[in-house]
Amino acid sequence: MASFHVIEHVDSPRSFVCAAAERLKPGGLLVIETPNIDSLPFKLLKSRWRQFIPEHYFFFNPETITQLLAQHGLKIDSIRTIGKYASVDLIMNRLGRYVSWLPNVNGFSQLTFRVNPLDIMLVFATKSS
């Protein structure tokens, strides 16, 4: 079962995880992707962090998501951070919000790079037997 950017939007993460755990068979896998409130981008940017939006009712870090899942019989297999591909144009646009002296990147704007700001967790958990 997979949940990508859902748990931070629900009224009750406990109920959400409970419902997921009830539907999993023993040994079944739950995958959750959610912002990581312990990330460096949050620590540096605080309320300007791109994931700090009103639609996110709850935030988690590796410890709190581990505790929540354990309360419902789920054991963490791994927690990873994920990245994405971003164009030079997007990167410069995002950085330009905080740094006004960035150079012009004409001709390079469509180049893409893999970036990982370490602020999104991908959690793999298994239901206990």
List each language-model region with its residue ranges.
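Conserved SAM-binding loop
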Residues: M1-L44, F59-L74, D119-K127
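A C-terminal cap/extension of S-adenosyl-L-methionine-dependent methyltransferases
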Residues: S78-S129
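Short glycine/proline- and charge-enriched loop/turn segments
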Residues: L45-I53, M92-V99
